[in-house]
Amino acid sequence: MVSKSDQLLIVVSILEGRHFPKRPKHMLIVEAKFDGEQLATDPVDHTDQPEFATELAWEIDRKALHQHRLQRTPIKLQCFALDPSTSARETIGYIVLDLRTAQETKQAPKWYQLLSNKYTKFKSEIQISIALETDTKAPVDSFKAKGAPPRDGKVPASLSGLDPKDIVAVLNEEGGYHQIGPAGYCTDFFIMSVTIAFATQLEQLIPCTMKLPERQPEFFFYYSLLGNDVTNEPFSDLINPNFEPERASVRIRSSIEILRVYLTLHSKLQIHLCCGDQSLGSTEIPLTGLLKKGSTEINHRPVTVEGAFTLDPPNRAKQKLAPIPVELAPTVGVSVALQREGMDVQSLIELKTQNEHEPHHSKKRVLTPIKENTHTGPQSPSESPVPPHNQSPPTKDDATESEVESLLYDKDTKLNPKAISSSVPALLAKPVTTSIASEAASGQKIAVPATSHHFCFSIDLRSIHDLEVGFPINCILRYSYPFFGSAAPIMTNPPVEVRKNMEVFLPQSYCAFDFATLPHQLQDTFLRIPLLVELWHKDKMSKDLLLGIARIQLSNILSSEKTRFLGSNGEQCWRQTFSESVPIVATQGSNNRIVDLSYTVTLEDYGLVKMREIFVSDSSQGLSAVQQKPSSVPPAPCPSEIQTEPRETLEYKAALELEMWKEMQEDIFENQLKQKELAHMQALAEEWKKRDRERESLVKKKVAEYNILEGKLQKTLIDLEKREQQLAIAESELQRERRELKSERERNLQELQDSIRRAKEDCVHQVELERLKMKQLEEDKHRLQQQLNDAENKYKTLEKEFHQFKDQQSSKPEIRLQSEINLLTLEKVELERKLESATKSKLHYKQQWGRALKELARLKQREQESQMARLKKQQEELEQMRLRYLAAEEKDTVKTERQELLDIRNELNRLRQQEQKQYPDSREIASGKMDGPHGSALEEGLDDYLTRLIEERDTLMRTGVYNHEDRIISELDRQIREVLAKNNASN
């Protein structure tokens, strides 16, 4: 057991995430996998910052943690997007955590970026911390039934202060019972027993890919009864489970009400089928039916819950396996009984087995008080020590179809390595009556004649080498030689693998035979009958295959050199040894050599056999114990005695007795052979039926598994066909797009080349035109330069003439006066033209200004309406802002208009000054005519100015932007009043 301080928890805290896209119809799940165990968080919303807030923990001890750190075992976290409507999962990315970073001290969480992120535009991260914590909870066996969620149990009114969760079973070692509930209130004694009676179809729990921990595994049922671990007697055959029903009982001190509450809280009993420390399947027995509410059945008879319960493999939910058909479902027959102490116990469940129908006697196991009671099977009888070089008999587990004969011959027996036989009996020294009386007293006897020799023949198949076939073989060697006294085949074990260019030594290949025979018969047999050694290829997946046979000529040893040695009794003995290699020739096809066999044979002659009797038993083994009895040899008749008849001589009687004995032994041997044949045929038939049942159940299991695999394969094939169609469509689309892109590229390239060619041609043509233009311009330049020179010369000539003419005309006064008049007229015309132009520009400016003001007013009105519609709640503030804005704009407009008016006024003043400067001379010339028109012109100017001011004021008022309180309107009114006042004053 691991101490509590060495028990740790690897805690991975998955806190939150960031930089995830929003997918409202999906959920996020994080699965963590460590050491083959997988844990997952609860689904959370797929937002940009998902909140997981989950801790995942694995139990581990320090030794295993150290091993994992040395191996750098990772903790892999995978993030999935789950669609709740279809249960489809998409892999988003994964994170690999290093176990070596986990410490027992608290560490700050870190952000880990998802690898192979599906959201390539987002750098999704998850905040994770990993730490080691001491596992403080009590150690629980991995196969114990976990407590069901607490249910509402009602406590009696007298114990209303007792919490149902506090009701536990406490062992009282002195009293030998479990106390459930308060000791003062709960005083009734009960007996609770669990019986596992039978099991069927257990082979369905082991898939084809599962490896069992042992070559010959033992299976057993395990459950926990009030904290006591209980296992039944192990069994090794899953197909035909044969075990005695066992009942485990516990003594309980409680009351019916408290016990009912306790059974409500612990409502299920888990029973596991185990192999070693691995659970192959489990089932749950409901216990709530034992004590039903308001039932008093327990006061009269035991209450039971019994039946055949289906075993489920532990990983069915994880692997999403298909359900097993009902007729193939593995079941276990269980009976749970509860009774008051002292009540007679009857059989609670009918014991059903497949192979036998007679009732079994259940074993009873009392669990209280707790003692270390180890239930073991019956011990096998001790065997005599096996001598070295013993040929071990073939066992049942190693048997295949090719070994049926060996199995049947050696069934329930052990092969004596040194078989004793009497092949050739000599003359009998006893009369017939003595032999018959001896047989009646102690069974059948064989008298070995004194002329026979005691031989020991040993065979050692050392090795095989020089393999000629092109594939490795997994071989055993097998032979039999009935002359040595045993017809059972001798085989090497275990199988060895032989490859090319290698020599393999055979295990357990030595065997020795002790027998008695005549030397000339031994020589004759060795010359006539060779020893045939068969080479078999063993395959776990198929039937054994006979590859070839080697012929060993045993007569070769007779010609080898004899060596002398002393026997166990100090007698002189002889030994002959012979070694060689023989080829093993193929049995099928051409007789080609397969491999060479190296062997050594030894023949030891221990001399003459003394007169002995061999008792032959009727057992199926055919081997007998040897009892040696010294026989009194009758004295030889004296020669002086009278000669008797030939039929009365001892030799004749001995020969007659020998013939009769031979006939009797032949009959006995034939009867024994028939009995053995019948027994062997019966055993073979039983074995065949058993194996047929096993094969049938295995075939059913395989068919069910293959049907499931076929369904998966069909689904996979359909998916593959769809995928292939999609790939074909996508590939054709890709080819089409590739062709289009290629054609478009070629077209663009052609267009580009054409445009480049045209641009080059245009450039060349443009350069030529520019050159021609330059040439033309040069010619024009020379021509114009020539014209300019001519014009300058002409101008100089005309200027000289003009000066001369001017000098001539300047001397005349009327000419000078006329020239001045012309100059003044020209200036007047020019000033009138400028005045008209200024007036037109002023009118145009006024029109543009009016349109701009109207447009500005319209835009302001639209802006005000939109602002009023959008921002009604902020009307006052926006009104102030609008007023400020209008005031500022009005101020700017007033400034601009004032500046423009000032510019106009300055222009008018400048024009008036110019007019006043231009006309003083004309006034002096016609002073009398100028006085009257001057007053009228001034009045007309004031009227025009007044009209213009009124038009400007009315234009501004019509725009709707200004009112009478505005400064510009007030200024115009003031100027109008001043003009009116001046006009009145002049009148």
From Swiss-Prot:
Subcellular location: Cytoplasm, Cytoskeleton, Microtubule organizing center, Centrosome
InterPro entries listed in its UniProt record: C2_dom (IPR000008), C2_domain_sf (IPR035892), CEP120-like (IPR039893), DUF3668 (IPR022136)
Functional summary from the UniProt entry: Plays a role in the microtubule-dependent coupling of the nucleus and the centrosome. Involved in the processes that regulate centrosome-mediated interkinetic nuclear migration (INM) of neural progenitors and for proper positioning of neurons during brain development. Also implicated in the migration and selfrenewal of neural progenitors. May play a role in centriole duplication during mitosis. Required for the recruitment of CEP295 to the proximal end of new-born centrioles at the centriolar microtubule wall during early S phase in a PLK4-dependent manner.
List of residues that carry Phosphoserine: 936
UniProt feature coiled coil, ranges: 670-919
Species the sequence originates in: Bos taurus
UniProt-annotated stretches for the region Disordered: 352-408, 912-937
Any one annotated GO CC term: centrosome
Domain of life of the source: Eukaryota
Subunit composition and interactions: Interacts with TACC2 and TACC3. Interacts with CCDC52.
GO BP annotations listed: astral microtubule organization; centrosome cycle; cerebral cortex development; interkinetic nuclear migration; neurogenesis; positive regulation of centriole elongation; positive regulation of centrosome duplication; positive regulation of cilium assembly
Main location: cytoplasm
Protein name per UniProt: Centrosomal protein of 120 kDa
UniProt cross-references to PANTHER family, sorted A to Z: CENTROSOMAL PROTEIN OF 120 KDA (PTHR21574:SF0)
UniProt keyword annotations, A-Z: Coiled coil, Cytoplasm, Cytoskeleton, Phosphoprotein, Repeat
Similarity annotation: Belongs to the CEP120 family.
